[in-house]
Every structure is written in C-alpha cells, then in structure tokens.
Amino acid sequence: MQFNKRIDANQLDMKEQVVDIRRVTKVVKGGRNFRFAALVVVGDENGHVGVGTGKAMEIPDAIRKGIQAAKKNLLLVPTVGTTVPHEVIGHFGAGNVLIMPAKEGTGIIAGGPVRAVLELAGIKDVRAKSLGTNNSRNMVSATMDGLRQLKRAEDVAKLRGKSVEELLG
C-alpha cells in the first residue's frame, strides 16, 4: 500500500534525464529578463521515479535545480514482473496518457516524454498512448498521475477485505 511517506533519494542510485529546456522571458521596464526552465525526470530504474522543474539564469543551474526538485517528490511505482498491474489513464491539464500492460518482450511503446518517465521508473514492457495535448510538461505530469493511480492486487484485496484469489476470480 502506498502511503505519503518521503522516499530518501540519497539511498538510491538515481539516473536523470532532461526532458525539456525552455527559455522564458519576463518583460520589465528596462527590457527583457531571460531565464531557462528545465524539466527533469529522475529514477533508479527499479520502481522509483520523480519529476521536477528548475529555473535559473544558466542552463546547468536550471537542470541542477530540476534534479533537486525531482528527488523531493519521488514516487514508488507498483509493477507486476516487467509491466504495470493494470490499465490506467493519467490526466493533467489538457493532456491524458493511457498506460496499458504488455507481454514480456514487448518493450516500451510510448512517445518521447512519456517514454522517459516509464524507462526511469524501471518498467520494461508497457504500451502508452498520449491523448490531447502534446506539451511535454503536461505529458510528463499526466504520466506521473497515471503511475500514482496504479495499485497492486494485494492492496486492492486488502481494501475490500477479500483474498487475492477471490478478487482475481
């Protein structure tokens, strides 16, 4: 069962991937102030994944801040073998991501930002379809929402007060 306890990123061997870097502008009386915003995904490829955004005047600083933010909101993803336990739809803004289990050996069938999250989560066989917007920030957040909704059969059986055999039929 997933509780809202914090996962210590320092004890995990984390890998990071930069999904998106944008130059953002603030217009002031004296002209324009440019900054960079980086969207970063971190994961240990063993069930832990997190997403963070960092903003700074320089790109490396923005990426570093994004990594720190991602490590602060890690998520434990329940898996069944090499895939997800069940089909789920994640929503964020105008973006929806349909995540479906796949047979072993299928690989990750997903588009850019969604693929980055699923790879770093350690899911090896999965199919995903991006619906709605193709904005990378919304796609990553919708994928995280979908992964947050996943539940193992044991957890659902415990919630319903039944055994796993009764639940699965």
Curated annotation (Swiss-Prot):
Residues 14-77 form the S5 DRBM domain. The keyword RNA-binding applies. Pfam families: Ribosomal_S5 (PF00333), Ribosomal_S5_C (PF03719). PROSITE patterns: RIBOSOMAL_S5, S5_DSRBD. Belongs to the universal ribosomal protein uS5 family. Part of the 30S ribosomal subunit. Contacts proteins S4 and S8. This is Small ribosomal subunit protein uS5. It comes from Alkaliphilus metalliredigens (strain QYMF). The gene is rpsE.
